[in-house]
Structures are given as structure tokens and as C-alpha cells.
A protein has these predicted regions:
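Structured core elements
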Residues: 66, 204-206, 336-338
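Loop-rich catalytic cores of soluble enzymes, especially ATP-dependent carboxylate-amine ligases
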Residues: 155-158, 162-330
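Glycine-/small-residue-rich active-site loops that bind phosphorylated ligands and cofactors
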Residues: 131, 210, 343
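Terminal catalytic/cofactor-binding subdomain
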Residues: 5-191, 199, 234, 347, ...
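Structured mid-domain segments that build the active-site/substrate or prosthetic-cofactor binding neighborhood
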Residues: 288-378
Length: 445
């Protein structure tokens, strides 16, 4: 056994040496064909370093809602009393309007922005919050505001992972060129991109990082745990008008949506991975949408590196490139954790508490960093497949998924202030029962 392990180690080290040489050759080729590449990598890295925030324990929360009328039909953007009018009604309390081409596309106030996703899913992005009681207040207030704005047509803002009635292809896109171009490009890959755009709704949690090392450590842990977060937050009982074929439909949607920009960030687990590697990843992704000289969207399937081969990117162009990748864990000026379905507010707050306790509790994060050591992108992909097939009964990373989730609840509680422990309870109860919100919905049908 020892001899076999030694041989395997030599083989792996030999392969790593070959990979390093191949990477160096590719980088040299890219530098030759993209003279501004190093300057653009530096511009992206500068932005990422500027995002570092020492001693912060804040969470940002984004929650998407699927708007339907009293019959379950989608409420479109442009219909009478549609989502455009919902935004107009919300403007009384969220007075900062985003208007493009005469279309109202978002409203905001300090600390809270209401925007719309491709098929008019209503999203509240709020925070960052130092404490969860403030998050609870903001989200409950928005829930009441949305209810009032939708009441003229008996509408509802559903917190589910996928439209429970309508097929994605039948849903209207909002008037935004970015989404037209994304729909065209992703449709050429398969049906999953349009399903993501039109049918899905999510919960996303963002966390701060202190420096580059802290950022990469948090990204790696979040990537390893992403399949388990998806399980704990699974809230898609219905998919494309029928009972779902298996658990974690959001995971499957993103698995096949576009391999160039989804799933794990390539190389995230490689020794030495850092901001420069993430910047190179951004430059090597097909843009789909680029910005012209007036800041307007245009269709472009070249990579960002090719588009900006001969000049430095502006800040707006850097921000845009960051928004055009959709991995499980995305980096901007914060770490964005993306695998969870949209959920009712008590579960959103529980999920935020889970993330806060795991990633800001010093001993909890240190425990997770040790536990995640040696896990690869392939291991994460296998974990997703196992959880889609077997849920809590699955084995992932050579352990029981259910037992890992138990430990995550314990570690999160350890990392939270005692005054916020109770926020974890809704999610902890689901984990203890080995069920998801989707399971509970299916069991009542």
C-alpha cells in the first residue's frame, strides 16, 4: 500500500509539473495575443484587494420572488398592473429609480435595492447587515410592501426555487438587452440557461473578507459546502409544470447551463490560487454581453481578454465582467455564495445565520478549512450528483451527508453570538428531520 501511494504521489507530482508547464506556455501565448492582458489582470486584482475589510462580520442577502396572479399565471413586466407597475408602487418607499430606455427596472433606498431578474422575478438585495435582527426587519417590511403593491390584481410574490405552474419557455423576458443576448447565447448550449433565467429564483448570501488569503480560504470552503447548502435550502418541489424528477433541481440547472461560467471556478483548489488566477478566469470567459462606448449592452462571444486585448478595462468594464460569470461561489468585492433556492423569510434568515456562524466564527472556519483540505473540483461535482440522487441519504466526501449537515449546524451555532442562535432554528429543524422544504411540499400534495 505504501509503495502504491508513493507511485501515485510521483505520478500526481509529474502530472502537476506537466500542467504547470502547459499553463506557463498558454499564459505566454495569451500575453502575446493580448498585450493588455497583464494590465487588465492588475485592474481586476486592484478591485478585489480594495474589497478587503478587516474585522467585518457582515452579511448581504439577496432574495428573489416569483410573481404570479391569483390563478398562478405569471405576472409579466409589461402587462397592466404588471411588475413595472409593482416597481412604480414600491417607489414611494424606495425612491431611487433605475430607468433605462423609458423602462423602470429598479427602485432603491439606502441599504435596500429592488430589481428584476430576466422573467420579472422580483429581487430584494439588502445589507450588508452587522446583525440579523436588522435583516429580519428589512425583509419583513419588504414582504409587506410587495404584498400591498401586488394586491390590485390579487398577486403574490412566491419564495420558491422554481415557478410552480408555468414552463420557463412560456415566460416573457423583461425589456433589457443583456437578457436578450444571454437568452440567445445560453439557448445555443441547451434548455438549461433559459430555464435558469425564466423559471428559477434564489437566495444568495454575501460575506466580507479581510485579505486575499482569507478570501480564498472562504471561497474554497464555500465551494466544498455549496452542494450541502443546496440540499439544506432545497425548495423546488415542481419543475417545468410537473413534480420534480429528483432533488436539488437548481443544482442541475447550473450544472448544465454553461460550463464556461458555472459550477466551480477552475483551479480554485490549486495550491497558490489567488486573485490573479480569478482575474485570468474572468478574462477567459466568453463575454456574451459587452459594453459599447456609451455603456450600452451589445452581443459579443469573444472572451473578455480578447475584447480588451489592446487596452485597459475601465472600472465599469471590470464590474461588468465580474457579473457575467455564475459559479457556485462568485467573487466581487465580497464573496457571494449562490447555490440556495428562494425560501420563505424565516429560512432565509436561518441560512444567513448558518453562513455567518460558519465563516465569521474563527474556530468554526478553521475547522472547516482543515476538513476541506484535499477536496477537488471533481469531488464537488460527485457530491452534487450524489445529493441530487439521494438527498440526506447520500455519502459525500467519504462521509454521510446528513452527519456533515448536523456538524454544520453545530459549528454555525458556535460561531454566532448567543443572541442570534435562534435564527438557525428553522433550518436546524429541517436538518434534524432529514427533510427539505421541497420534501414537505411534495408530502402534502
Amino acid at each position: 500500500m505504501k509503495g502504491g501511494n508513493a507511485w501515485a504521489l510521483c505520478w500526481r507530482e509529474g502530472n502537476e509539473d506537466l500542467m504547470r508547464k502547459a499553463t506557463a506556455a498558454r499564459n505566454a501565448q495569451l500575453a502575446s495575443s493580448q498585450p493588455a492582458r497583464e494590465e487588465n489582470i492588475a485592474a481586476i486584482v486592484t478591485h478585489l484587494r480594495a474589497g478587503a475589510k478587516a474585522e467585518c462580520r457582515r452579511v448581504g442577502i439577496e432574495l428573489e420572488h416569483i410573481c404570479v396572479d391569483g390563478t398562478g399565471d405569471p405576472i409579466t413586466y409589461s402587462q397592466p398592473n404588471g411588475v413595472r407597475d409593482v416597481l412604480a408602487a414600491l417607489q414611494e418607499k424606495y425612491p431611487e429609480a433605475t430607468v433605462h430606455g423609458g423602462d423602470l427596472l429598479g427602485v432603491a433606498r439606502p441599504g435596500a435595492a429592488v430589481t428584476i431578474e430576466p422573467a420579472a422575478q422580483l429581487e430584494l438585495s439588502a445589507g450588508p447587515f452587522e446583525n440579523l435582527i436588522d435583516a429580519k426587519r428589512v425583509f419583513l417590511e419588504f414582504e409587506d410592501d410587495a404584498y400591498q403593491a401586488l394586491s390590485p390584481i390579487g398577486g403574490r410574490a412566491l419564495t420558491l426555487g422554481f415557478d410552480p405552474v408555468n414552463r420557463a419557455a412560456d415566460k416573457e423576458l423583461i425589456p433589457k438587452a443583456r437578457y436578450d443576448y444571454m437568452n440567445e447565447y445560453l439557448s445555443s448550449i441547451g434548455p438549461w440557461g433559459p430555464r435558469m433565467m425564466r423559471g428559477s429564483a434564489s437566495t444568495q448570501i454575501s460575506i466580507d473578507y479581510a485579505d486575499e488569503a482569507d478570501c480564498i480560504a472562504k471561497m474554497r470552503v464555500a465551494q466544498v459546502l455549496a452542494p450541502l447548502f443546496a440540499l439544506m435550502c432545497d425548495n423546488t418541489p415542481v419543475f417545468e409544470g410537473s413534480r420534480r424528477p429528483h432533488a436539488l433541481m437548481r443544482t442541475e440547472i447550473w450544472k448544465y447551463c454553461d460550463p464556461d461560467r458555472c459550477n466551480s471556478v477552475p483551479g480554485i483548489f490549486d495550491e497558490g490560487f489567488g486573485f490573479e488566477d480569478y482575474a485570468a478566469y474572468l478574462l477567459d470567459v466568453p463575454a456574451i454581453v459587452a459594453l459599447d462606448d456609451d455603456g450600452e449592452a451589445r452581443y459579443d462571444t469573444r472572451t473578455f481578454g480578447e475584447i480588451f486585448a489592446h487596452r485597459a478595462m475601465t472600472d465599469d468594464e471590470v464590474f461588468h465582467a465580474m457579473s457575467m460569470v455564475f459559479p457556485d461561489v462568485r467573487l466581487k468585492s465580497y464573496v457571494e455564495i449562490r447555490p440556495a433556492d428562494s425560501m420563505p423569510i424565516p429560512y432565509v434568515l436561518a441560512y444567513a445565520a448558518l453562513i455567518k456562524g460558519l465563516f465569521y466564527g474563527k474556530s468554526s472556519l478553521e475547522t472547516l478549512v482543515r476538513s476541506c483540505a484535499g477536496i477537488s473540483e471533481s469531488d464537488v461535482a460527485k457530491a452534487k450528483d450524489a445529493l441530487m440522487e439521494s438527498g440526506y441519504a447520500a455519502e459525500v466526501y467519504q462521509r454521510s451527508a446528513a452527519e456533515i449537515c448536523d456538524e454544520l449546524i453545530t459549528l454555525a451555532r458556535r460561531g454566532l453570538p448567543a443572541a442570534e442562535w435562534y435564527f438557525l432554528d428553522p433550518l436546524a429543524e429541517l436538518v434534524a428531520r432529514r427533510v427539505t422544504l421541497a420534501d414537505l411540499d411534495i408530502s402534502t400534495q
